[in-house]
Curated annotation (Swiss-Prot):
This is 5'-3' exoribonuclease 2. Residues 971-990, 1014-1034 have a biased composition (Gly residues). Residues 991-1009, 1041-1050 have a biased composition (Low complexity). It comes from the Eukaryota. Residues 534-556 have a biased composition (Polar residues). The gene is rat1. Its EC number is 3.1.13.-.
Length: 1058
């Protein structure tokens, strides 16, 4: 997904949304593996109903894994996919439904990003093969053409082209058939699957996998008999699954993913037997297995743990953060969540480049939230409604961002320069420490001679070999536990130190070159396509313009390794020997990348449009044209997330985004989309694959990609420009490929279609979802009686949700299926046998279509879990919300302070002006006395009175009495209760209110007091007067903020602070 590092940012800001998955693993008894019994209760303490697999997140890491050798062939790949999928199912244990969704043909808006990724992936695969060939020649030269056969085979082996994981290729056809076989096999052989319904949506069904899943969830919500308390789990590595989970408005929703930040050094240790890999409660008392002759080896764990991301807890956090005190319209959490999702689109998505002034690592989302909160009173309503954006209100948010853009760019540059200076300093200090350690080692050596010449260039006294070169890596064991690799190497060096020395001197050159090339490959983003489309291990997915992904080598990913160590390794060119070719030195790490636009200097907008778009910098109308296209894109993306694809043919026609200041009069735009039809699979292949991946495309189209006479040869450049766009590495830059002209492409392909074989025509067709159930499922007899009895029923059979256990939709007979026929297998040699009697049932499944708009609201009958956040969590979130978004690159604060409020409505009237007391004087920021200046005429309450210790005092008499004396948030009969749709399925009488007694005020969460005033928990003592009548309580500390919120819009200056 296009918000890079979103997962890391969310987990840092909202820590309680993450929890580890408790997983039971199979174990061995007397050499026999005992499988996990998933019919037992879920060890995570909560049963799950539906599991959805975004299958590309499984296919990519299984076909080209990181950290271990890839499967030898496609059969082994299928087995790895089965194992991984089985593990996910075992840990989730869905009780009702499993949906497997593979990416089909994507909307045109996504194809531009796919095209850039696949061109980059093919280029990197080609470079990897060239490096392997170069290394093979070097080994042959250094060893006199005597190279180990196994090593020779590994070097010569071509890099597997991950571009075949695209709809329409033979590989995807094999994947679809293999998945259907494996599901049927599980239904026949695994009792835990007997009551499970499985839906497979393979690559022949148009749409991205995660969006096909969302379409299914929306269709089930529209069914009258849908259970509103269905518990959903979706697996995938894309960060947008989090926002899609929010967009469903299903309160019981989790995202499952690998813990990509897991550190192997923190393996679990059992305190009973002392072995790693399990905890005490999982101990089976087995003897420790000896690894190595002296038990010097450590048995590493090959399985990464999984984690939950609880969307329900994220909803709680956002409920506190997005609530604006005294907003002039009812607070509606579901609408506010939609606005939050919409604002995330500005920071990055798969369809639009992010705005230049917004970066998630600079807390760009916080900046937008702060602007949104400030403008809520002015907008008079929310930004979005059921997937439709109000562009007039969006204009206000962009105007607010535009006022901060100059300061954001300047502060970004200052931060980059500080970071560079710190890196230089750390490197210099590390170098000085290393030199000092080297001097100490030389002094302690019996061969030490205090001479000016370097020790390494002299032979020691008494003859013998020369001292080893300084570049030779030495092992310095720490006091703590040595890593497995270090123990193995230490043991080897002790036993075979003589051989190690001779081998080291002979092979140092080859090792240095190999290491250098591998590190260069890592820098350049090897397997960039895989990481972005499923095999991501330590980062969230890159956006369309390939944003900075520094997390790829961050210390938290690499364990205890320091950032400067990583950089030193990345630039280490080794120590070439006599026969080694010179290794080019990497670009200097102590210099900022060249940036000719210079966003931090005056005139950056002119330079930006002149260099990036190639237009006259004075052409203001072009800037507005780009901004209008971007606004259209925002509307498209929002509809795509909340209602489904609004247009298969629309796309953003530029490589770069406009500035926030360029969005002028977008509120007057009328946006409509032509639905269109999706591409056929071969058309997408021709649109996204480079010519070097033509092996995945039918031969009849090859000449269109390679012949100089081809009418579309310009679509397939062998070399293409990469704009670093201020980044350090090429893989972070913007790939400048020509956009595909749909009409030209389809016209050229139309001439070749008659030459396709029957199998190729079948791969190019549009498929359907299939539903599989076992013979033991109650629905089995119902469907067999309709489709396979002597008196057959209707052709399209509408499912009875009581019999189907909550599944809505229609099914049709699958002509390729015959009841109780054999189930052939092409994987028998891998332990997947054929079955003589297939006792499962396969039918075509049709997702029900609804004529109604999917409403952004909770369904009637929802029952919430107990709140996960306590009052302290809520107050902390609210405090941050009121003081965030300024110190991360926005306009400077008055007096250099952090936080505070900013009014972006300098040219708009104060919406509260008619209600303010003319005699009121707002508090002065930074009051010397430490406490606020109280309103004139205000008198402290008498101890023991009704208003005593009840939060902040009331405003002056006659001032905002209407708003202050309303029942506080979470208190009072019916204030935030609503009817939740009584009398109608969608609860349209809800009016944006929430029953606090059932959710947000459970367990006295808000202490029965006004949540916008903070309650007793927010005042650090609950009122100072209760402590002897002095002013020590926390109430006055927050009163200043309360007054700021009440009167923040009085300031007429756009950068005023209160």
């Amino acid at each position: 997904m296009g918000v890079p590092a979103l997962f890391r940012w969310l987990s840092n800001k909202y820590p309680k949304i993450i929890s580890p998955v408790i997983e039971e693993l199979p174990y061995e008894v007397n050499g026999e593996e005992i499988p996990v019994d998933i019919t037992k209760p879920n060890p995570n303490g909560e049963e799950m109903d539906n599991l959805y697999l975004d299958m590309n997140g499984i296919v990519h890491p299984c076909t080209h894994p990181e950290g271990k050798p890839p499967p030898a062939n496609e059969q082994e790949m299928m087995v790895e996919i089965f194992k991984y999928t089985d593990r996910v199912v075992n840990m989730v244990r869905p009780r009702k439904l499993l949906m497997i969704a593979v990416d089909g043909v994507a909307p045109r808006a996504k194809m531009n990003q796919q095209r850039a990724r696949r061109f980059r992936s093919a280029q990197e695969a080609k470079e990897a093969d060239e490096k392997k060939e170069e290394f093979r020649k070097m080994l042959a030269k250094q060893n006199g053409n005597k190279v180990d056969e196994e090593l020779q085979e590994e070097v010569v082996k071509k890099t597997w082209d991950s571009n075949v994981i695209t709809p329409g290729t033979p590989f995807m056809d094999i994947l679809a058939a293999s998945l259907r076989y494996w599901i049927a096999y599980k239904l026949n052989t695994d009792p835990a699957w007997e009551k499970l319904k499985i839906i497979i949506s393979d690559a022949t069904v148009p749409g991205e996998g995660e969006h096909k899943i969302m379409e299914f969830i929306r269709s089930q919500r529209a069914a009258p008999e849908h259970d509103p308390n269905t518990r959903h789990v979706i697996y995938g590595l894309d960060a947008d699954l989090i926002m899609l989970g929010l967009a469903t408005h299903e309160p019981h929703f989790r995202v499952l993913r690998e813990d990509v930040f897991f550190q192997e050094s923190r393996a679990r240790t059992c305190h009973l037997c002392g072995q790693q890999g399990h905890k005490a409660e999982e101990c089976r008392g087995q003897a420790k297995e000896k690894n190595g002759e002296f038990d010097e080896k450590q048995k590493g764990s090959s399985l990464k743990p999984f984690i939950w991301l609880h969307v329900s807890i994220l909803r709680e956090y956002l409920a506190a953060e997005l609530y604006v005190p005294h907003q002039p319209f009812p607070f509606d959490l579901e609408r506010a969540l939609d606005d939050w999702v919409f604002m995330c689109f500005f920071v990055g998505n798969d369809f639009l480049p992010h705005l230049p002034s917004l970066d998630i690592r600079e807390n760009g989302i916080d900046t937008l939230i702060a602007i949104w909160r400030d403008n809520i009173p002015v907008m008079g309503g929310y930004l979005t409604e059921d997937g439709h954006v109000d562009l007039k209100r969006a204009q206000l948010i962009l105007q607010g961002l535009a006022k901060q853009e100059d300061a954001i760019f300047r502060r970004r540059r200052q931060a980059e320069e500080r970071k560079l200076a710190n890196e230089k300093r750390r490197k210099q200090e590390a170098k000085a420490r290393e030199e000092e350690r080297a001097r100490k080692r030389r002094r302690s050596s019996p061969t030490y001679e205090p001479m000016d010449s370097p020790v390494g260039h002299r032979a020691p006294r008494g003859g013998g070999d020369a001292a080893p070169p300084n570049q030779l890596e030495l092992i310095t064991p720490s006091r703590g536990e040595l890593s497995r690799q270090t123990r193995e190497l230490t043991h080897s060096m002790v036993v075979n130190r003589g051989a190690v020395y001779r081998a080291n001197m002979a092979n140092k050159s080859a090792a240095a070159v190999l290491k250098s090339k591998l590190m260069q490959g890592s820098q350049n983003g090897q397997n960039g396509e895989e990481k972005s489309e499923g095999a991501t291990t330590n980062n969230d997915e890159p956006s369309q313009d390939q944003p900075d992904q520094t997390e790829q080598t961050s210390p938290s990913v690499l364990g205890k390794r320091k950032a400067d160590l990583v950089e030193e390794e990345d630039t280490d060119a080794g120590t070439p020997g006599r026969d080694s070719p010179a290794v080019p030195v990497a670009a200097k790490e102590d210099e900022l990348p060249p940036d000719t636009v210079r966003l931090w200097e005056e005139g950056y907008a002119d330079r930006y449009y002149e260099q990036k778009f190639g237009v006259d910098p004075q052409d203001k109308e072009f800037r507005h044209k780009v901004a209008r296209a971007y606004a259209e894109g925002l509307a498209w993306v929002l509809l795509y997330y909340f209602q489904g694809c609004p247009s298969w043919t629309w796309y953003y026609p530029y490589h770069y985004a406009p500035f926030a200041a360029d969005f002028v009069d977008i509120g007057d735009m009328e946006i409509t989309f032509d639905k269109g039809v999706p591409f056929k699979p071969f058309e997408q292949l021709m649109g996204v694959l480079p010519a070097s991946s033509n092996h995945a495309i039918p031969k009849v189209f090859h000449d269109l990609m390679s012949s100089p006479d081809s009418e579309i040869i310009d679509f397939y450049p062998e070399d293409f420009a990469v704009d670093l766009n201020g980044k350090k590495f090429a893989w972070q830059g913007v790939i400048l490929l020509p956009f595909i002209d749909e009409k030209r492409l389809l016209a050229a392909m139309e001439k070749k279609y008659p030459l396709l074989t029957e199998d190729e025509k079948l791969r190019n067709s549009v498929g359907r979802e299939v539903l599989l159930i076992s013979e033991a499922h109650p629905l089995y007899q119902d469907l067999v009686a309709n489709f396979y009895s002597k008196k057959q029923g209707v052709q399209k059979y509408k499912l009875n949700m009581r019999i189907s256990d909550g599944l809505a939709g229609k099914v049709e007979r699958n002509e390729a299926y015959i009841p109780h026929s054999s189930l052939p297998s092409s994987l028998e040699e891998y332990g997947m046998p054929s079955l003589e009697d297939d006792r499962s049932l396969t039918v075509n499944y049709e997702i029900p279509k609804s004529n109604h708009v999917h409403k952004s609201m909770l369904l009637r009958g929802v029952k919430f879990n107990p709140p996960a956040l306590d009052n302290a969590d809520i107050q902390a979130v609210k405090h941050k919300a009121q003081n965030s978004g300024r110190s991360y690159g926005g306009a400077p604060l008055r007096g250099g302070q952090k936080g505070g409020r900013i009014n972006y409505a300098s040219d708009r009237p104060n919406p509260f002006a008619a209600h303010l007391d003319p005699g009121f004087i707002p508090p002065v920021p930074g009051n010397v006395g430490g406490g606020p200046i109280m309103p004139s005429g205000w008198v402290p309450p008498i101890p023991g009175s009704a208003g005593f210790s009840r939060g902040p005092p009331p405003p002056p008499h006659g001032g905002m009495s209407g708003s202050h004396h309303r029942p506080p948030y979470g208190q009072g009969p019916g204030q935030y209760q609503g009817n939740h749709g009584q009398g109608d399925h969608y609860g349209q009488g809800q009016q944006g209110y929430y029953n606090q007694s059932s959710y947000y005020n459970q367990s006295n969460q808000y202490n029965g007091r006004s949540s916008d005033h903070g309650g007793s928990g927010g005042y650090r003592g609950g009122g100072g007067y209760h402590r002897g009548g002095n002013y020590r309580g926390g109430g006055y500390r927050d009163q200043r903020q309360y007054n700021q919120d009440q009167y923040s819009s009085r300031n007429s200056g756009g950068y005023g602070r209160y």
